[in-house]
Amino acid sequence: RSSYAFVTDPLPREVLGKLGHTLVWESARPYLYLRSTQEGRLLIGGEDDDEDIAERRDARVMEKARTLAAKVEALWPDLEINPTFCWGGTFAETDDGLPYFGPHESLGPRVHFAMAYGGNGITYSMIGAQLLRALIEGREHPLGALFSLQREPSMASTRR
């Protein structure tokens, strides 16, 4: 599977409005996410598809960026969105839709993983960073079992 994203040039504070210092995850299928950066850019992504051949994925990047920009403009009609840097990437996902964070029992406690974000790396990266930091510091994290590589299959694994 592949996902697509782009970043805008820095936008003036008055143009960004309430989107400054925020993260939005619109969960329709295909989903849309955006977040602002410290310098006033918008990072926008989504438009996942089943493409796993890099050349074909890369040929779709501009079309996907235009589609994402149009979706953001439909949600916030006062914004004019122009992709500055665009990219696509292949991703992995688990049966239950949650990423894996932490050690694998067969590799010992000093090898940690952060993987299978299912195209939601922007959303899950902060949780993963906090969880891995706690593990490295020898602390338990309240979400550790939920994202463990040794977790039990859940009802969510029947989501498809």
Language-model features and meaning:
Residues L34, M62-E63:
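Hydrophobic pocket-lining "lid/loop/helix" segments that shape and contact the acyl-thioester
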Residues R1-T37:
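Flavin-dependent oxidoreductases
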Residues E63, T67-K71:
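A non-catalytic, amphipathic alpha-helix used as a structural packing/dimerization or gating element
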